[in-house]
């Protein structure tokens, strides 16, 4: 039961953070000299980084 709660919490955090993560990746891609980062794995990486920032303090 606890595993289900943890998975639901992760899903809710991922859904609520997704628009800001997408906006950040678009802003980074618009910078000169930056390669355009598009893909599921890049979004997962950004979501994991944002999730870890929540628990840093």
Swiss-Prot record:
GO terms for biological process: venom-mediated paralysis in another organism. Its main location: secreted. One of its GO terms (cellular component) is extracellular region. Residues 24-29 form a propeptide. Residues 1-23 form the signal peptide. The keyword Signal applies. It comes from the Eukaryota. Keywords: Amidation, Antimicrobial, Secreted, Signal, Toxin. Expressed by the venom gland. It is found in: Secreted. GO terms for molecular function: toxin activity. The keyword NADP does not apply. The modification Glutamic acid 1-amide is found at residue 56. Induces paralysis 1 hour after injection into insects (blowfly L.caesar) but does not appear to be lethal. This is U13-myrmicitoxin-Mri1a. It comes from Manica rubida.
């Amino acid at each position: 039961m606890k595993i289900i709660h943890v998975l639901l919490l992760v899903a809710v955090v991922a859904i609520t953070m997704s628009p800001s993560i997408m906006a950040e990746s678009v802003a980074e891609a618009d910078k000169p000299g930056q390669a355009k980062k598009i893909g599921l794995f890049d979004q997962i990486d950004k979501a994991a980084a944002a999730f870890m920032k929540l628990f840093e303090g």
